[in-house]
Every structure is written in C-alpha cells, then in structure tokens.
Amino acid sequence: MIIFSGGTGTPKLLDGLKEILPAEEMTVVVNTAEDLWVSGNLICPDLDTVIYLFSDQIDRNRWWGVKDDTFLTYERMQKLGVMESMKLGDCDRATHIIRSNFIRSGISLTDAILELASIFGIDAKILPMSDDPVSTYIEAPEAILHFQDFWIGKHGEPEVLGVDITGISEASISPKVLEALENDDNVLIGPSNPITSIGPIISLPGMKDLLKKKKVVAVSPIIGNAPVSGPAGKLMKACGLEVSSMGVAEYYQDFLDIFVFDERDQADEFAFEKLGCRASRADTLMTSTEKSKELAELVVGLFDTIVCP
C-alpha cells in the first residue's frame, strides 16, 4: 500500500496501519514543501515525523519531534544571541545533521532518507515526494511567509489571502515514488492538511493522471466545519474550498474512489456520489493506537471493494 502523508493526522493513521500490515508492504510518500534550511541543516518536518513514528521514537504528546528530547543546543544558541526560527531538540538536530551531510556528499534527498530509515531500523519505505526543491508560501496581508514562518513563527494567526507552492511546476515525482506507483494499485491519502500537506504531492506534474489509474481512498481531516488540528480550515477557505469533508472530497474528486469521513459529521453520505466517489462513515478522531488500528482496518478493507480502473 502507498500512503500519502504530511506531518499531522496521517502519522496517527500510520500508527494503526503498522499494527495490521507488515512494514515492508507500506510505502509512505511524504510532503517536502515545508522543508527548510536552519543553521546549515535541512529540516524535513513531515519526513522526520514519519521516521520517528516508525522507529517508535516520536513524542506522542505533541506528535512531532523525539520523545524525551532535550534542547541544550537551542538554548545555548539563544544565550549566544543566535535566534533560530524553530525550536529544535538535540536528538532531532542530530537527524538533521546526518541528513544534511548525506546531501552535501552529493546524494539525493530520497537516498538520504533511505539511508536514515536504515539507520533507524525501519522496514517501511519512506520516500520524499520529490528530489527537487519545493516550498509552500502563505500570502498574508503584511508579507509573503514560508509556511513554517506562518505556522510556527506567527502561530498560524495571519489572515491567509492565498497559498503558493513555489517550484512545483518544475519539480518531478521522485523515481522511487514512480517505481512504487508502477508496482502498487492501492493509494491511501491520509488525513493531513489537504492544501499544504497533500496538495504539493498531488500537484506534482503527472501525479493526478497516475492516480486516476489507481484505487484511491482518502480520509478526511475535517469533522463538521473544522479541522481536527492545524490551519487546514483557514487555508481551504483561502483556496476557495468549503471547510468541510465535502470540500476535501471536492479537492480530490479527479481521482478519488472512496472518501472516509467522521461518523459525527452531518454530511450526507449520498451527496458524495455527485463528486463521483463513494463515502464511508467511521470514527476518524484516532485518540489512541487502538482507535487508529480500528480505522486502519476499515480503510484497508475498502480497497477490496474498488474495481481498479
């Protein structure tokens, strides 16, 4: 199975999937449009969250970073007058240093991540969506902000006038992702932010055409008219989408077969048929590994009900 993932929402579903599927049968294609260089090292927030999840090192209270991490380097740099744009833990920083050294040696981001996954003892295949640089920028009233500056630096508070994924039209789907798509018909779009987490992946040239030939199941990150977490609602509105499960399904409608939305949602299950997909209700909140596992079992079973195009 191929899973499209950002750094929030989908990792909780991956937590359930790894309970029911052999790790070597999972390929996780991860958003890289939020990556940035900090203090000479490449930070890949979404990729690292997936790495820490599969290596059982993730901080489950925050669902990012390394559990029990310390921040001595960050604090020391502050004392020396160097203010970093992100609060990076020491163990987390070690990951960034190792990855950056791999890249400086001349290998691709994909190969650097595969090397890291091997170091962390991970059997699942974790792949960046592209080896080309892509960055998400938020158009706010006062400035154009990198997504990390908007979300971490400004706490997601500025009004969003637009979203621009710089470099996406020139970027290519990574060869390893293309290989995975050639060999697997099942694609799961996880409940990550549709605009800034999944959006860059499906906006890569040629990706939507490939997905039209696959069995595609998507899980909604929205319950009612609000996201479970993060700024998805504000971003969807800025992109002209209704902030609802229906709005998410509409965003994916070109290639979507089945859409999973929350059982508490008031959306009409049959309304999704107008978008050309079926819908399935489930508990999508994932408040525990057991809840994640239950959702994962339902989602995996749905693929057997789809006739491949």
Swiss-Prot record:
Alphabetized Gene3D superfamilies for the sequence: CofD-like domain, CofD-like domains
Cofactor(s) recorded in Swiss-Prot or TrEMBL: Mg(2+)
Q: What is its EC number?
A: 2.7.8.28
Q: Which cysteines are joined by disulfide bonds?
A: none
BP terms from Gene Ontology: F420-0 metabolic process
**Its catalytic activity?**
(2S)-lactyl-2-diphospho-5'-guanosine + 7,8-didemethyl-8-hydroxy-5-deazariboflavin = oxidized coenzyme F420-0 + GMP + H(+)
Q: Where does 7,8-didemethyl-8-hydroxy-5-deazariboflavin bind?
A: D48, K87
Q: A GO molecular function for this record? A: LPPG:FO 2-phospho-L-lactate transferase activity
Q: Which CDD domains match?
A: CofD_like
Tell me the keywords, alphabetical order: Magnesium, Transferase
- Top-level EC class as recorded in UniProt: transferase
Taxonomically, which superkingdom? Answer: Archaea
According to the UniProt entry, the coiled-coil residues are none
Assembly and oligomerization: Homodimer.
* Protein name, entry field: 2-phospho-L-lactate transferase
Organism the protein comes from: Methanosarcina barkeri (strain Fusaro / DSM 804)
Instruction: Tell me the name of the encoding gene.
Output: cofD
